[in-house]
Curated annotation (Swiss-Prot):
It is a peripheral membrane protein. Component of the A-type ATP synthase that produces ATP from ADP in the presence of a proton gradient across the membrane. The A chain is the catalytic subunit. Hydrolyzes ATP, GTP (86% of ATPase rate) and UTP (54% of ATPase rate), has very poor activity on CTP. Belongs to the ATPase alpha/beta chains family. Keywords: ATP synthesis, ATP-binding, Cell membrane, Hydrogen ion transport, Ion transport, Membrane, Nucleotide-binding, Translocase, Transport. PROSITE patterns: ATPASE_ALPHA_BETA (PS00152). The N-terminus (approximately residues 106-122) interacts with subunit H. Has multiple subunits with at least A(3), B(3), C, D, E(1 or 2), F, H(2), I and proteolipid K(x). This is A-type ATP synthase subunit A. It comes from Methanocaldococcus jannaschii (strain ATCC 43067 / DSM 2661 / JAL-1 / JCM 10045 / NBRC 100440). The gene is atpA. The keyword Cell membrane applies.
Length: 587
């Protein structure tokens, strides 16, 4: 029997109900006559404190609260890709078709996965086979990019006594497993999983392979590993959202889960408009075919922001369990923290720093800890990963505020966006002096093997040049560049080339929007070769003006716009020769 209580207090999204004896923590309840979805977050005697995931205006004390007996869960199965959900996995397009309203009516209940679509199920096991949790029993071609693998649910193992082939809906039985104690378990193509509970795996693997994003500053200087975590903090207008869009478009993950958590609706609209037309460079299909969107914009109820983050990570873990690589981007975790602060205030909890609750750090850590590269459950030892990239919006660009500082304690890659760079039209506006990656040592072997054996050396030299430039800039502003020694004038010029010809990247140019690893390595090698040859010329007594006037500098400036294959196979060698000839002949 479901628990039935009644409302005694309402404070914004927080509702208190009495008569709830027998209810459980984090149980989903239906609140009021309109059956609004809520979740129990505190229990005292027979009173339950509920956070409601919909607008609570108009409900009144005395209305019923009915328990569902289940925690907040998501439906996992075919039909999630290309879909667009709100924070508690309600499909927005299906709601619009059902209600005819462009806004979500209160209390509307539409299943997350379509129940009327029949999917073509192809079995990969036979009757009599022994299966355990996480094994693949069949596949569904969900989109041209992704084959949806149907897994044995967690906690089920035994012998297949029946397996079907053909077209089925997500609720129809496709297999029957007889467990060791003789119980028959029916398996459908859909599973339910509580969002706050991480999905299990066999073993966590070290993050040794870089996630290639095609953005030079992120790949070469501040690498994110597959299964890693990154934060993108930055003030307004510094390019957080465009950076996340670039990651969602070009990173070499199989599936992208994009959570718009408390940000502007226009940004989600941009994703919906752009992604169906853009091509995935690895499969040649549309980007939307590998994307799940969770739209929880700033005008939607506050409590659902927290749910949207957990909904997104659970969907990501499910695709990871199939053996896919998943990139999860959350834009922005600051809005989720603000929602926690608001609800904590309504609960009259003791505030921590800047009014955020004392458990802010542990909640952030729980979320980021669900990233990782793993060996999944199942006999075939598949590997999958979840990368989490969280945008952080510190008010006034202050990186010492609690959300940013707590996030930095947890994540291993920090891409610091700089409003000054954005104003100078330097994009991506990632500040190379503030940013860092703690994965560099782990991924060096991959880069050295797949690009060139001197990759790490080139990267470290380039970084130290940029740091040297920052030190010299103070002197230049006092006395001007002409007062510097010749060697340091060369350093300033090469640092400028690194900034403008390597770090700057045009997201709207069809060639430069994505830069493959080999091209990144060769571009860096060319600039550093110019530096070495220029230093040799300085030692021979050549004036800096002559060195800085060579024509090869124009070729270096144009190299990012040369088509990748042509550059890697032909042009890079030509530019390298030209550098050695032009600078070598100066005397």
């Amino acid at each position: 029997m479901p628990v039935v209580g009644k409302i005694i207090k309402i404070a914004g999204p927080v509702v208190v109900a009495e008569g709830m004896k027998g209810a459980q923590m984090y149980e989903v309840v239906k609140v009021g006559e309109e059956k609004l979805t809520g979740e129990i977050i505190q229990l005292h005697d027979d009173k339950a404190v509920i956070q409601v995931y919909e607008e609570t205006s108009g409900i009144k004390p005395g209305e019923p609260v009915v328990g569902t007996g289940a925690p907040l869960s998501v439906e996992l199965g075919p039909g999630m890709l290309r879909a667009m959900y709100d924070g508690i996995q309600r499909p927005l397009t299906a709601i619009e078709e059902k209600t005819g309203s462009i806004f979500i009516p209160r209390g509307v209940d539409v299943p997350a996965l379509p129940r009327d679509i029949k999917w073509e199920f192809k079995p990969v096991v036979n009757e009599g086979d022994y299966v355990e949790e996480g094994d693949i029993i069949g596949t569904v071609d969900e989109t041209p990019s992704i084959v949806h693998k149907i897994l044995v649910p967690i906690g089920v193992k035994g012998k297949i006594v029946e397996i079907k082939e053909g077209k089925f809906t997500v609720e129809e039985t496709v297999a029957v497993v007889e467990t060791e104690n003789g119980e028959r378990k029916e398996i459908t193509m859909m599973q339910k999983w509580p969002v706050r509970k991480p999905r299990p795996y066999k073993e966590k693997l070290p993050p040794e392979i870089p996630l290639i994003t095609g953005q030079r500053v992120e790949d070469t200087f501040f690498t994110l590993a597959k299964g890693g975590t990154a934060a993108i903090p930055g003030p307004f207008g510094s390019g957080k959202t465009v950076t996340q869009h670039q990651l969602a478009k070009w990173s070499d993950a199989d599936v992208v889960v994009y959570i718009g958590c408390g940000e502007r609706g226009n940004e989600m609209t941009e994703v919906i408009e752009e992604f169906p037309h853009l091509e995935d460079i690895r499969t040649g299909n549309k980007l939307m075919d590998r994307t799940v969107l969770i739209a929880n914009t700033s005008n939607m109820p506050v409590a659902a922001r927290e749910a949207s983050v957990y909904t997104g990570i659970t969907i990501a873990e499910y695709f990871r369990d199939m053996g896919y690589g998943v990139l999860l981007t959350a834009d922005s975790t600051s809005r989720w923290a603000e929602a926690m602060r608001e609800i904590s205030g309504r609960l009259e909890e003791m505030p921590g720093e800047e009014g955020y609750p004392a458990y802010l750090a542990s909640r952030l850590a729980q979320f980021y800890e669900r990233a990782g590269r793993v060996i999944t459950l199942g006999k075939d030892n598949r590997q999958g990963f979840v990368c989490i990239v969280g945008a952080v919006s510190p008010p006034g660009g202050d990186f010492s505020e609690p959300v940013t500082s707590n996030t930095l304690r947890i994540v291993k890659v920090f891409w610091a966006l700089d409003a000054n760079l954005a104003r100078r039209r330097h994009f991506p506006a990632i500040n190379w002096l503030q940013s860092y990656s703690l994965y560099i040592d782990d991924v060096t072997e991959w880069w050295n093997t797949n690009t060139g054996p001197d990759w790490r050396q080139l990267r470290d030299e380039a970084m130290s040049l940029l740091q040297k430039e920052a030190e010299l800039q103070e002197i230049v502003q006092l006395v001007g560049p002409d007062a510097l020694p010749d060697r340091e004038r060369v350093i300033l010029e090469v640092a400028r080339m690194l900034r403008e010809d390597f770090l700057q990247q045009d997201a709207f140019d069809e060639v430069d929007t994505y830069c493959p690893p080999m091209k990144q390595y060769l571009m860096l090698k060319i600039i550093m070769t110019f530096y070495q040859e220029a230093l040799k010329a300085v030692e021979r007594g050549v004036e800096p003006a002559k060195i800085l006037g060579v024509s090869v500098k124009q070729d270096i400036a144009r190299m990012k716009y040369i088509p990748h294959d042509e550059f890697i196979n032909v042009k890079s060698k030509e530019i390298m020769e030209k550098i050695k000839n032009e600078l070598g002949s100066l005397n």
